[in-house]
């Protein structure tokens, strides 16, 4: 699997993510591994493992977005080998979130890990959180 192949997969992934913020998880789901070791950690809930849980989590998460569009993908890092690849990006969108009628800006810090399955790069892990800028150390403290 070449770097060129991987770059094409990343482009497909970014287009699928734009569909996701329109409320459609299906293109994104097709890019994920359907194996039991696939994991997803999104900002709307705890991390999940296994295809069935990942698919259900994606469907729930996508249902929170409407009328979205991608406004940019800022590459932080990329690494590709024959057996594993990852990207770290800041994903930027605008759209309606939850029940709000207002279009808002969305920024996510994301790490995605890929591996080849049957000659095709598949996502085996995605971690996304809304931390796209510096925060004070106390921001990690949770109330008791």
Regions found by a protein language model. Give the residues of each.
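A beta-strand edge to alpha-helix "cap/lid" segment located at domain peripheries
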Residues: 1-27, 37-144
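Conserved catalytic core of Hanks-type protein kinase domains
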Residues: 31-34
């Amino acid at each position: 699997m070449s770097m060129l192949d991987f770059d094409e997969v990343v482009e497909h992934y970014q287009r699928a993510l734009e569909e996701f913020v329109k409320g459609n998880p299906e293109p994104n789901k097709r890019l994920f591994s359907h194996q039991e070791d696939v994991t997803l950690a999104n900002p709307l809930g705890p991390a999940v493992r296994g295809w069935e849980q990942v698919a259900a989590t994606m469907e729930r998460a996508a249902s929170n977005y409407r009328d979205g569009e991608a406004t940019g993908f800022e590459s932080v890092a990329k690494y590709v080998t024959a057996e594993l690849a990852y990207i770290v990006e800041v994903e930027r969108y605008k759209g309606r979130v939850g029940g709000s009628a207002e279009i808002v800006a969305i920024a996510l810090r994301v790490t995605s890990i890929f591996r080849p399955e049957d000659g095709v790069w598949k996502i085996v892990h995605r971690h996304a959180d809304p931390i796209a800028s510096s925060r004070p150390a106390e921001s990690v403290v949770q109330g008791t």
